[in-house]
Amino acid sequence: MDEDRFHIEVSKALSSCQLVEEVLKLYISESYELARKCIDGKLVFKLSGEDVEDASLERLITTFRKLTDNEKLVAKLNKFKSERNYLSHKAIAHCLDPMGNLDWGYAGELKKRLDRIQQDSHDLRLEIHEEAKTFRAHLYF
């Protein structure tokens, strides 16, 4: 793997993390829409998807946890958050030697984590989508 390929792999993994965030935002937005529909003017309800538009992954998970009983999925999301935080804040720095060049030994090890992050992201997106099926039909009918 050359340096350009390494950076592409890191970018793909980070992009997959962003997709998890987007799916969580959609779940939260649709949950709020259903709540608004059920409340139907009986109570002021001003929560909306805009409230989480710029939210961190941690805040999205905290909000999601309040809208689901699926603690197993919440636990997976928290584990994923730890890996995503490592990737976002530490992984690339750990791949650099003191001169700022890529340490190929560590970069090779990181590649395994990047692949796992992408797979976990895919699996989580599917699980969140499945969780949304529990209420989505009520939103439109």
Task: Report the location of each language-model feature.
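Amphipathic alpha-helical interface elements
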Residues: 1-55, 71-72, 78, 89, ...
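Short amphipathic alpha-helical segments at helix-loop
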Residues: 1-5, 65, 106-109
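N-proximal short alpha-helices
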Residues: 50-53, 57-60, 94, 101
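Short, solvent-exposed, charged loop/turn and helix-capping segments
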Residues: 59-74
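Generic secondary-structure transition motif, activating predominantly at the C-termini of alpha-helices
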Residues: 64-68, 81, 118, 122, ...
